[in-house]
Swiss-Prot record:
Involved in a nucleolar function. GO terms for biological process: ribosomal large subunit biogenesis; ribosomal small subunit biogenesis. The gene is surf6. Residues 16-98, 110-184, 191-210, 273-341 are annotated as: Disordered. One of its GO terms (molecular function) is DNA binding. Residues 150-176, 285-302, 330-341 have a biased composition (Basic and acidic residues). This is Surfeit locus protein 6 homolog. One of its GO terms (cellular component) is nucleolus.
């Protein structure tokens, strides 16, 4: 009996274990329905908010996606006949539709880029116009290059002709003129407008510098040098001396016509120099007097300042002595005065 009872209890336990086996379902996450605060709500899962499309483009894309998605049959019987479950068919259809959409988009982008690069989008008339325009531009550039080459070839020839024309004139104008050292100019640069004017003036008026300015000492020395030169020329050749004198007179006349004062009179220059020296001496005397006066005034002011300072000091001492006398003190000065009296 005991063995039967033990067998019966064993079988009952085994049956319970078999009946109460857990169903093999996919494990759920532990924290599936945990709020942000940390509190759990097992029965109420968080609802995800649907994002609205931001602009029209997004809406259009979403519409395209909905159109291209094939409709899934909702009848489970038909699916069962075909040997497919509803979940498996839905996932397959959705994946198929997304791949198609992506491929279509890629093809559209490739076509757009090709149309931008190539001229297929252009009409044949537009393409022909563009070709003609490019051809004209090339021809214009060729013509321009040829013109530039011709100009470059012609320029040196023109310069040579000018040099040949100007050379006889320069040979005629070149005469033996005495060198004036203060007018020598050396320059490797091309002649600008100022230099051209200067050269023209020299051609017309000559290279002799006019006697102008207020530096009378220098003018006198130049006059003496000119006289010495004339005497030397007269000793050698009177014709050259006369030519030199006529050139000097001609330059003086031209400068006077422009309104420039010519100071070539020796007596007047000496008188002007004396006047200038006299005025300079007078200025020096005035300056000396002024410096002496200013020094005397400064000394007087200093003396006055010292006297005032001494007076103030003496007044302070007298004030202190008077206070002491009022308090009943007898000062040595008072004793001396009493004995003297």
């Amino acid at each position: 009996m005991a063995s039967l009872a033990s067998k019966d209890s064993y079988l009952q336990k085994l049956a319970k274990k078999v009946c109460t086996q857990p169903s093999q379902e996919p494990r759920k996450r532990k924290n599936e329905f945990i709020k942000r605060d940390g509190s759990e709500e097992p029965g109420q899962p968080n609802k995800k908010k649907k994002k609205k499309p931001r602009n029209k483009k997004m809406k259009a894309q979403s519409d395209k996606r909905t159109w291209n998605v094939p409709q899934i049959t909702s009848n489970p019987q038909k699916l069962a006949k075909n040997g497919q479950t509803p979940s498996s068919t839905g996932t397959a259809a959705s994946s198929f539709s997304t791949v198609d959409i992506l491929r279509k988009r890629l093809q559209e982008k490739i076509q757009e880029s090709r149309s931008q690069l190539s001229n297929k989008s252009l009409t044949p008339e537009d393409a022909e116009k563009r070709r003609q325009r490019r051809k004209q531009e090339r021809e214009r550039k060729k013509r321009k290059r040829k013109e530039l080459k011709k100009k470059a070839a012609q320029e040196p020839e023109g310069n040579e002709v000018k040099d040949t024309k100007e050379s006889p004139e320069t040979t005629k104008e070149k005469d033996p003129v005495p060198i004036v050292f203060n007018n020598v100019e050396v320059s490797d640069e091309l002649p600008n407008k100022v230099m051209q004017k200067k050269a023209k003036k020299e051609r017309v008026k000559g290279t002799i510098t006019p006697m102008t300015g207020k530096n009378y000492k220098q003018l006198l020395s130049r006059l003496e040098a000119r006289k010495c030169k004339l005497e030397e020329l007269r000793a050698k050749d009177e014709g050259k001396a006369k030519e030199f004198e006529s050139k000097i007179k001609w330059t003086n006349v031209l400068y006077k016509a422009e309104g420039v004062k010519i100071k070539d009179d020796e007596g007047m220059l000496k008188a002007a120099l004396k006047r200038k020296e006299k005025k300079q001496k007078q200025r020096e005397k005035r300056w000396d007097k002024r410096t002496e006066l200013t020094a005397d005034r400064m000394q007087q002011r200093q003396d006055k300042r010292r006297r005032n300072i001494m007076k103030k000091k003496q007044a302070k001492v007298d004030k202190k002595k008077n206070r002491a006398r009022k308090k009943g003190r007898i000062l040595p000065e008072d004793l001396a005065k009493a004995n003297f009296k």
